[in-house]
Amino acid sequence: KRFSDGAQYRFEVPGIQGPKVMSALLEEMDRYDINLHRVTQTKGIMLLTDNEIIEMVKLAKQGQTDLILAIGPRATTDTSASVHTEEGVRMGYRLRGQEQIVRAIEDVKRAVAFGCRSFLVYDEGCLWVLNEMKRAGELPVDIHFKVSAHAGHGNPCSARMLEIIGASSINPVRDIQLQMLASMRQAIDIPIDIHTENPKSTGGFIRHYEVPEMIRVAAPIYLKTGGSVAATHSWD
């Protein structure tokens, strides 16, 4: 399996939270003559001003890279106390209540109005309703939805379910093993996004030595890099 241009892999840099750092990143990519295919913001659209979104969309077009903006509403910024407990943390970033679904949709619609077409999704129900809106013509037909590693998926059955309800690519759990990755690839056709390195908050492990095998068993694959310099998922 391959990308539409025949490539087996592409590069993605996550955790690019605003236009200033995005501009610096793209300048370095040019300096080293490296093609960057994706830039992902993780803190949430709701934490960006209109002008910041406009500038990031502009930079993406100039740099010929895809910009992925994260849906802002999530359990950790909701009023729930449970997510901050040892047991409750297992709910991840999923949305609680229909009101949060509505807010997430409005977050996406705001960014769409400024030209963004790719979004990072944390909640399966939110993914489903956004895809239904796409099918109904309420969102652009060229919109893409990337499922975050924070959704906690790591098996072929879950991967297939996500593909069915609208995922354009899937980021499995960060410590997924090669044989697990291979089984996911057998179940789906959409790209898989894989962390080749990780922030300290999610283990800090570096998997560069596994990259050739990742490509062999899981292409088409987005190789995510740059995470080991960050302290946390939404680090500035």
What residue ranges belong to the model's regions?
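Hydrophobic, aromatic-enriched interface-forming segments
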Residues: 165-168
